[in-house]
């Protein structure tokens, strides 16, 4: 009888521990709607005149990207920003072109070869982990991507670990409800700050490209 009671108690403890572990490993549901990550025609990112409308050189200046920098393009899509950043950081720098879409990663690989940009490193991430090397980045940018992230705390924790002290992290996006390919600026700022970042600048010159805000953060 005593042995049976001990076995039941042990079994109960195992069940409780397993349930607790499963809950800990299961991400909480999104606190707001998110947009489905884009998997369509990548050429839509290559609109003529976009470079000028978005003032991408100014964006890179404000992120303090220079020759020799290592920068992550998170949610790189067609590699539109990646190729421009690659030219900025030069042969001694690197651009980590991350995307969760295997077709996009393959597209960027081919594009980098075609444009002779050996400093672009395509990386296949997951929805919750961009697969970045800890303490490796001098800067990072999410261009029209944040509203697609279902679990920001997980992605931001991985990004935070990858950024060097003082490295700048930029988010360019438009105001929306999350499900309409945009997310309210105040929500983005709150989530990023809760993940251990501090906002250091805010700009709206990206409105010319249909994007409402450009936020810059550093990790605390």
Q: Where are the regions that the model predicts?
A:
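A short glycine-rich, Lys/Arg-flanked "PGG" loop and its adjoining helix->strand segment in the class I
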Residues: 86, 153-168
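A short SAM/SAH-binding and catalytic strip from SAM-dependent methyltransferases
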Residues: 138-152
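Short glycine-dipeptide loop
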Residues: 67-68, 91-92, 163-169
């Amino acid at each position: 009888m005593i042995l049976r009671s001990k076995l039941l108690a042990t079994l109960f403890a195992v069940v409780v521990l397993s349930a607790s572990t499963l809950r800990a490993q299961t991400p909480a549901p999104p606190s707001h709607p998110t947009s489905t990550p884009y998997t369509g025609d990548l050429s839509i990112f290559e609109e003529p005149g976009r470079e000028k409308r978005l003032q991408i050189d100014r964006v890179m200046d404000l992120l303090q990207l220079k020759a020799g920098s290592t920068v992550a393009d998170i949610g790189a899509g067609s590699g539109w920003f990646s190729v421009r950043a690659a030219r900025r950081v030069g042969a001694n720098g690197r651009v980590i072109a991350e995307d969760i879409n295997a077709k996009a990663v393959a597209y960027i690989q081919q594009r980098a070869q075609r444009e002779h940009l050996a400093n672009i490193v395509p990386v296949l991430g997951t929805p919750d982990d961009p697969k970045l090397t800890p303490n490796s980045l001098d800067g990072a940018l999410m261009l029209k991507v944040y509203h697609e992230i279902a679990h920001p705390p997980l992605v931001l924790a991985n990004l935070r670990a990858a950024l060097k002290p003082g490295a700048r992290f930029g988010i360019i996006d438009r105001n929306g409800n999350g499900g309409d390919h945009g997310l309210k600026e105040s929500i983005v700022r709150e989530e990023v700050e809760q993940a251990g970042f501090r906002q250091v600048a805010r700009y709206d010159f990206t409105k010319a490209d249909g994007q409402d805000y450009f936020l810059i953060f550093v990790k605390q």
